[in-house]
Amino acid sequence: MSGRTILYCLPIAECLFGALATLALFVTPASAEPPKQADARNKPLEVAVFEKLLAKHRDLTYDELTAKLKQRSYLDKLSFDPTQAPSFDLVAKKMQLTKEERGIFARNAFVSIDQNRRHTFASAYYQIYTGDLPVLVTSDSILHAMHRSYDDILLELETTLFTWTIDQILADSHQALAEKASANKDAALAANYRDVDLYLTVARNLLAGAGAPEKATDQPNDVWPGGLLVPSRLEMDKEVLAILKHVQSLKLQFPKRTPPTEIYGGTRYLDYSQFKPRGHYTKTTELKRYFRCLMWLGRIDCGWNVLPTDGTPGIESDSDRELRDAVLLCELLQATGSLKPLKALDDIIAFMIGRSDNLSVFALRNAMKDGNVKALADVKEAKALQRVQTGIRNSKQAQQMIRSQVVISDPDDPYYKVPPPATFQLFGQRFIIDSFVLAHVVFDDIIFKKKKQERMMPRGLDVLAALGNNVAVPLLADDLRKFNYSANLLASREFVDLHKPEFWKANLYNLWLDSLRSLHEDMTEHKRFPETMRTKAWQMKQLQTQLGSWAELRHDTILYAKQSYTAGILCEYPAGYVEPYPEFYGRVKYFAEEAGRRFEAADYSIRNEKLASQLKVIKQHQVSFFKTMAESLSSLQTLAGKELKGEPFTAAEKTFIKKTIDMRGGGSGPPRYDGWYCNLFYRRPECAKWDPIIADVHTDPTNNRCLEVGVGDVNFVVIAIDNDKDRGVYVGPVYSYYEFHQPAEHRLTDQDWQKLISTGKVPARPDWVKVFQAPARERKP
């Protein structure tokens, strides 16, 4: 028995979740045999490119990293006293600025104010409106509207088209399986029928409500007392029930702590805590069930390993058997006519989020075609199976770019990084570039001077640094020096920069990230850019904007994205200014235009007459909404461009800003918000709904914790703007961003997070926001 220590790790870009997890635990190995090296033949091109970039920067230090970064010429001081700017006294009085808030404003010419009230972006705009204050149209507010609309559209599709289609595909495939199994006379293939029966029966039970808590824990109630809701067709009830009980437990299986799951003739450790519904999936019982079902159909460790794992520690599988399982499922999908609706559904998810980071049904079918294989019976013999395996290897579409299950890595072996297995899933998790970044700035990807660095938890700042925000890098200095991952961070940035415009336009997720990238464009040399916005403090505020929007993006895609494990009222604002980022508004406009085109072209056909009629109306609403959104963004882009050119606004453009928001009396009912800002919300009547969100984006089981990122109450920014010789003070709404550690067994839902905010129990904001953020005010009753 060797005395060395092995580090179990899951740099889990968790398949359907908001939690890229690098899971680690020290244990004693059973054998001192050196691990086999990864098969380079299976590596995706992206991984090979990243590794070359990483090798180029081997052993890079933090000081060497910062020396390579382009430095900006930030303004050290302003040419005017912001407290003497016209309208400051009015704004200070109306906003009741505290001594500390005045101090930060005097120093930076802007300050972020937390009134400790349950403000939304719409209600914040309305407070500015009712206070007769000059309005600042913020990038934060535009991004938040984009989040709300994206999330609502996804939810709408899930509760109509997606749920019905998946239910039908599973039911049809299960029936066909039973028929084929009864006709099978080959005992050697019986295990494959049982494996696929297990896979389908678990999925159907989860969609029917199995796996829910035994007792009601929150609203809406979703309870499962036990027992199968859909029976196995091949006497696999016991095995199915065992997995459903694991799902109900929400426990993380881990070496030396728990036994693994016996599945598909082998064993593996599954993180069942990831089956806890989060994001918008807690809103209805049906969504909770859909969440669990898609988790099963998407998590890599629930799928089939289709190429040999070469004895990868932590995984025991028969890849020949599991590849036959996948071939059988493809055969069933073909026989039942399920490929067309499956492809239509996959295409919608692909243009909203991205492509699968695993072997998909369609990629496997291509390999089967190349190997002259149509059915399970065709791969009974080893030679036929090998032809399919060769096709899979040649396609390089099976090897994951982000590892997503429990494996074991030796911290003392600097030459071996555990490769992610080649895995098949029906609705596999999607590759997203920010998860790729997070997966490469943690153990076991960091090697410095021939020693693996045990950095178990990434930070949101890693993503922004890789996306090109230089302000984020010094904020990571402590981590970079302690864990020596400067080479990984620089390689990640260069990897991101290598992607051509087509990549950023490939899907709505990438378009969203690309919009965020435009907010750290260097405008310090632009003489018409407001002096206040040419300071480092302002760029820190924009960093918060980016992180807040990124948290909303990860929240919205938590199930699909692969993650690394309100008075004397005037009816207008007296004056207004738009944050002068024309490129940002242009990219969001393109997001809206492209979304409109993609949704119009999407296949919503369904074998349900009532739903088909409903989906026709839904599509018309989606296309019309994005057209209106694009028109508003076009106006903002024009206004921002004019500000930078020093051109005056037309009367119509002035009216546009003044009509950002309004609120009409509701008579005996509630008031109704109005204005172009409300038109940016897919569900317009809910534009002022209070909805702070939270998402766990990384898990560290060694310390039993996860990393949570979220946004809280909307804050106000008070800012002095010099627009040529015209100076004024404006007020606008901005994000409040939170990032903190939470016990892994208590991952937060939006409802949990909102309760913490309402009771004043939120954790501290990141230290770096203190540059522009005043302390939260006392809560007023």
Where do the model's predicted regions map?
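Bacterial N-terminal signal peptides
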Residues: L10-F26
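Short intrinsically disordered, low-complexity coil segments enriched in acidic
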Residues: S2-G3, L25, G314-I315
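Long, non-catalytic protein-protein interaction scaffolds
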Residues: P34-P781
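Boundary at the C-terminal end of the N-terminal hydrophobic targeting segment
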Residues: A30-A32
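N-terminal secretory signal peptides that target proteins for export/translocation
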Residues: M1-L10
